[in-house]
């Protein structure tokens, strides 16, 4: 099976939509995994975007893992639950904390895996990062404690899904970055890193996970941690020229 993957397409921006219209993904996979930040699911135009028609026609199955931007139309995170899904086309679905079987011997574990913000960095992070103005938790704006609560929920789901898996091949797909080993040196020491990255390196190294697909950082850094290949294929912001390392046909073959 060929599992194609990409993330951070940011179709909410005209520059990104135009770029992908003229430079479409190369449909070389059986399944397409999109690891977050594709568009705003609360926008009335989200499901109408022509990208979904194209993706539906070119892949047997399209799996979307929501990133933080998916919730930027004041989506209420409190409405999410393990196994939540949103059908976009007949074979295109967005999943939150869900295990998706791919054939008889492959499982894809899909979770946003929010990162984790330390108390000392919380004030500045809430002041700077748009998540805390554009996402809700109940009737209140998202704050760092709820952000961290979602991290714990996602990680607990992930641990249980991995422990319970009988699959020969386990693939994890998250939006947030699962280790500082995957962080670009330019961000080292930033007090905003807690909104992007969480250190799970020891967990990954001890796990049976074969591949871990991630996004969010707009920097594509691949690294083997233990026996797990951590891979990323983010388009990023075209208007900021972040798309240079994007590969229109990146695949995992199993």
Q: Each predicted region: which residue ranges?
A:
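Active-site environment of divalent metal-dependent phosphoester hydrolases
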Residues: 10-16, 40-44, 69-79, 99-102, ...
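Short amphipathic alpha-helices and their capping/turn segments at secondary-structure boundaries
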Residues: 20-24, 51-56, 93-105, 109, ...
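Active-site-proximal loop/helix segment associated with metal-binding centers of metalloenzymes
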Residues: 109-171, 176-187
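Hydrophobic alpha-helical segments and helix pairs
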Residues: 78-134
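Beta-strand-turn-beta hairpins that frame and shape the catalytic cleft
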Residues: 1-4, 99-110, 169, 224-229
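Binuclear metal-dependent phosphoesterase catalytic core
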Residues: 102, 184, 191-210, 218-254
